[in-house]
Swiss-Prot record:
Keywords per UniProt: Acetylation, Coiled coil, Cytoplasm
An example Gene Ontology molecular-function term: identical protein binding
InterPro entries hit by this protein: FN3_dom, FN3_sf, Ig-like_fold
GO biological process, alphabetically ordered: negative regulation of cell growth; negative regulation of G1/S transition of mitotic cell cycle; positive regulation of DNA-templated transcription; positive regulation of receptor signaling pathway via JAK-STAT; positive regulation of transcription by RNA polymerase II
Name of the protein in its database record: Cytokine receptor-like factor 3
Any one GO CC term of the record: cytosol
Fibronectin type-III domain sequence ranges: 181-274
Gene3D superfamilies xrefs: Immunoglobulins
Length: 442
């Protein structure tokens, strides 16, 4: 009885500790949720503020542009009025000058005639004779024609008031406010030297024609375009390991020119070591990141291997052929358990590969199944999974079995690859006998 009573406080103490730990854990979780709420509130507040600024700026720009366009149109119309006025007034001015000249001539003639007549007949006959002679040379019955009012311009402005209704309708329909963008980033998948970005449409009423993906380092202020097209997935290459990047996507509606608002930016990074070719091999020139190999015109031959065994089972290894040269049946692109110098091709033991003609080799033996020939732009992928980790039967002739899937040009072959011993990671390599072949690995 006493032992039970002594034990009871210990149990109570233990239970109290557990309750305290549970309460601490609960408090931490609630703290995380509070932080999540703060982030959500911040996103709403900041996006609302940004949207207000965008709307104000846009409509101010619109008002300025419309005012400028209206002013320019007014100036054009006023210039047309000036031109018509000047062109049609000139004939009237000429006619007025002619009439005024006739009036002056007639007034002079009247004065001369009256003076001549004051002298009467006799000694003033000479003046009368001179006046009569002068008057006979002036066509007093010839009057210039003055145009009727119906025959001269009467300027007016034709202004269609319906434009106000048209503009009003467009203005009332101009712009929308959306509570969320029509597309969002769905998933970020790390790859060696890259990140696969997948996005999806979240607005069922929005019909997307194209998507636009941008990214930047989190330390940068500038996003840059990395993909524009109709696909909903893209691998962003040249990603530095263990560096945070920000991604965002938008869409363009069917038949529209403008892009939708950007999705909520997502942060991702890759912890995987980038795939690199071995530098310094005489027959190949490498890019600055050493993920692109170009077969140069050096006479040196052999297999160009990866710098390290960076391919692990369960991953997808991708080779993209950027340019092609003259094919040779000994060409090879593939993976191997270890580097072996002295070989001109991966068509050897402890390696699997595809030749540029599409032939598949496993441990140096050509398979019956064949893939399409490799061309410029072709993508060849290797997916390898461990099948057995223990010793297999002697009939299989190996100790470690891997299941390999090689895909190229929408075709694939699947087979088991037997190795002498287990290996946690694999090398990759390529060999080309003629220059011009360029291969990107990721």
């Amino acid at each position: 009885m006493r032992g039970a009573m002594e034990l009871e406080p210990e149990l109570l103490l233990q239970e109290a500790r557990e309750n305290v730990e549970a309460a601490q854990s609960y408090r931490r979780e609630l703290g995380h949720r509070l932080e999540g709420l703060r982030e959500a509130r911040r996103q709403i507040k900041e996006s609302a503020s940004q949207t207000r600024d965008v709307l104000k700026q846009h409509f101010n720009d619109l008002k300025g542009t419309l005012g400028k366009l209206l002013d320019e149109r007014l100036v054009t119309l006023l210039q047309e009025v000036d031109t018509i006025e000047q062109e049609t007034i000139k004939p009237l001015d000429d006619c007025q000058k002619l009439i005024e000249h006739g009036v002056n001539t007639a007034e002079d003639l009247v004065r001369e005639g009256e003076i001549a007549m004051l002298g009467g007949v006799g000694e003033e006959n000479e003046k009368l004779w001179s006046f009569t002679k002068k008057a006979s040379h002036i066509q007093l019955d010839s009057l210039p024609e003055v145009p009727l009012l119906v025959d001269v311009p009467c300027l007016s402005a034709q202004l269609d008031d319906s434009i106000l209704n048209i503009v009003k309708d467009h203005i009332f329909k101009h712009g929308t406010v959306a509570s969320r963008p029509p597309v969002q980033i769905e998933e970020l998948i790390e790859k060696p030297g890259g990140i696969i970005v997948r996005w999806c449409k979240v607005d069922d009423d929005f019909t997307a024609q194209d998507y636009r993906l941008q990214f930047r380092k989190c330390t940068s202020n500038h996003f840059e375009d990395v993909y524009v097209g109709s696909e909903t997935e893209f691998i962003v290459l040249h990603i530095d390991p263990n560096v945070d990047y920000q991604f965002r996507v938008c869409a363009r509606g069917d038949g529209r020119q403008e892009w939708s608002p950007w999705s909520v930016p997502q942060i991702g990074h890759s912890t995987l070591v980038p795939h690199e070719w071995t530098a310094g091999f005489e027959g190949y020139s490498l890019s600055s990141r050493r993920n692109i190999a170009l077969r140069n015109d050096s006479e040196s031959s052999g297999v160009l291997y990866s710098r390290a065994p960076t391919y692990f089972c369960g991953q997808t290894l991708t080779f993209r052929v950027e340019t092609v040269g003259q094919p040779d049946r000994r060409d090879s692109i593939g993976v191997c358990a270890e580097k072996q110098d002295g070989y001109d091709s991966l068509q050897r033991d402890q390696a699997v590969c595809i030749s540029t003609n599409g032939a598949v080799f496993v441990n140096g033996k050509e398979m019956t199944n064949q893939l399409p020939a490799v061309t410029s732009g072709s993508t060849v992928t290797f997916d390898i999974e461990a099948v057995t980790l223990g010793t297999t039967s002697n009939n299989e002739g190996g100790h470690f079995k891997l299941r390999v899937t090689i895909s190229s040009n929408n075709r694939e072959v699947v087979f088991d690859w037997l190795l002498d011993q287990s290996c946690g990671s694999l090398y990759f390599g390529c060999s080309f006998f003629y220059p011009g072949w360029k291969v990107l690995v990721f």
